[in-house]
């Protein structure tokens, strides 16, 4: 089994995944704040920063852009996704396979699971297949663990987020990507619930530098392994500046204010 902490998507046991699956999940609107980011090459360039341990993208972007960056960026293949146009119960169908991701040079795979949705049984079965195939390839598995749907009344509650991290452990993920529950204490509960599965924070919508870094600082103090972030990096005019600060907080244990100095 891959040991997260000594693999291609981590650094000293810590993780900073730069995600850019937003074009499918949210649409081009997410690129409007910094229009040049609609070109995936712009974000791949950002991902060459030393702080970034992997870049998560969908199949088409990986096919067309990753070959130019394979020496500088570790590819995390995001194997499922759905558009913002979908109006039914939360569901994220599989769009490509572990085998094909491995052919393209992926170092790891990622998969979203919406526990509590009416589509939970299909998503669990898809995740089982992906997890077992990833094991055969020696690739770590990151679960985007987002409980939501008819079975979930409030997906931001502390116990719901902790349940999400526990589900990632129970189903065999190496890393659980969960929402930040809003406090260090609540994050500690999510980390404890995950056992020895690493827990990373979802970056979420863009906020100011200090607020963002304070949440990352709290995650690290709670025993989290880092974060998976998109908009809070590449929606900034100077993404390298925030990555410099994240490097200090995640890998060096700096506080938010210190990291911005």
Regions found by a protein language model. Name each.
Residues 10, 15-55, 60-84, 89-199, ...:
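Alpha/beta enzyme core
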Residues 1-13, 234, 240-261:
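N-terminal charge/polar-biased segments
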Residues 201-203, 229:
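Thr-Gly-centered strand-to-loop micro-motif
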Residues 25, 234-235:
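Generic, ordered loop/turn and secondary-structure boundary motif
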């Amino acid at each position: 089994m891959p040991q997260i902490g000594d693999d291609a998507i981590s650094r000293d046991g810590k993780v900073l995944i730069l995600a850019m699956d937003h074009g499918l999940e949210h649409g081009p609107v997410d690129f409007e704040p910094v229009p040049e980011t609609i070109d995936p090459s712009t974000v791949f360039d950002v991902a060459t920063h030393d702080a970034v341990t992997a870049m998560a993208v969908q199949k088409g972007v990986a096919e067309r852009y990753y070959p130019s960056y394979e020496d500088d960026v570790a590819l995390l293949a995001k194997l499922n996704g759905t558009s913002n146009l979908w109006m039914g119960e939360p569901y994220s169908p599989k769009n490509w396979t572990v085998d094909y991701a491995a052919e393209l040079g992926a170092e790891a795979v990622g998969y979203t699971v919406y526990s509590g949705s009416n589509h939970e049984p299909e998503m669990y079965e898809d995740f089982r297949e992906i997890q077992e195939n990833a094991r055969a390839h020696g690739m770590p598995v990151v679960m985007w663990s987002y409980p939501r749907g008819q079975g979930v009344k409030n997906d931001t509650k502390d116990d719901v987020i902790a349940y999400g991290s526990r589900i990632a452990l129970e189903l065999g993920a190496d890393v659980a990507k969960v929402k930040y529950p809003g406090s260090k204490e609540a994050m500690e509960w999510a980390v404890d619930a995950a056992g020895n599965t690493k827990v990373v924070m979802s970056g979420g919508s863009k906020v100011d530098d200090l607020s963002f870094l304070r949440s990352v600082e709290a995650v690290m103090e709670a025993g989290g392994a880092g974060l998976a972030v998109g908009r809070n990096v590449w929606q900034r005019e100077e993404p390298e500046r925030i990555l410099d600060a994240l490097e200090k907080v995640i890998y060096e244990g700096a506080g938010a204010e210190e990291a911005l100095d």
